Amino acid sequence: MTARRAPAVNRDVLEGMLVEGTAALDLTLTDTQRNQLLDYVALLGKWNAVYNLTAIRDPMQMLIQHILDSLSIVPHLRGRTSARVLDVGSGGGLPGIVLAIVEPGWQVTLNDIVQKKSAFQTQMRAELKLANLSVVTGRVESLQPGVEVPEKFDMIVSRAFADLSDFVKLARHLVAPGGSIWAMKGVHPDDEIARLPEGSRVTQTIRLAVPMLDAERHLFEVAVDDAN
């Protein structure tokens, strides 16, 4: 069966959308960062035809629903010139690759259990020249500091990885002192918040406004008492 190809879109059109979107988010990108993000969209479309990394195949929708969606959390995570970040269930590299591009001082680790997705992530590290990006394959609950990963993380992020309560249970052992868990969600997940495990609590609820996207988006910060 022939793989479906993504429709061709002029790069200038995508760049215009990216410029408009980052302005709406009050983010300033360098020319290099802007080109890296556009290259990432092109590579995601190219690999997606073979590896089915995302159900979204239109480059304009990839830019909106993947790149701008990931960029929408950046203003809320900023405040550290350096940070160790783990992206759990990263899939095609979202939001981790976007974070690594726009925050070169952060050390970003992508995690997924599917080897072909890790292979794509590793390829992106090379293609986009992201020296601050690393990839680890395996279940997040099995990752141990000093073994599979060098140390604990200041921020652990996910984008629709799992139920919020499950995400906290699986990843809390990797939170560094003073660190927290950040979960990107669509509609407000009241039931998931009610099921948060003991010793964890939502400390921030942020309603995200993703440019050009008419959909509900939220970002939750969760603190865990056993981060030590």
From Swiss-Prot:
Catalytic activity from the UniProt record: guanosine(527) in 16S rRNA + S-adenosyl-L-methionine = N(7)-methylguanosine(527) in 16S rRNA + S-adenosyl-L-homocysteine
GO cellular component term, pick one: cytosol
Molecular function GO terms recorded: rRNA (guanine-N7-)-methyltransferase activity
Give the main location: cytoplasm
Pfam families given in the database record:
GidB (PF02527)
Cellular location of this protein? Answer: Cytoplasm
Provide the residue positions that the database annotates as binding S-adenosyl-L-methionine: 89, 94, 140-141, 159
What keyword terms does UniProt attach to this protein?
Answer: Cytoplasm, Methyltransferase, rRNA processing, S-adenosyl-L-methionine, Transferase
Enzyme Commission numbers on file: 2.1.1.170
What is this protein's function? Specifically methylates the N7 position of guanine in position 527 of 16S rRNA.
Q: What is this protein called?
A: Ribosomal RNA small subunit methyltransferase G
Q: Native species of this protein? A: Burkholderia cenocepacia (strain HI2424)
Protein's gene: rsmG
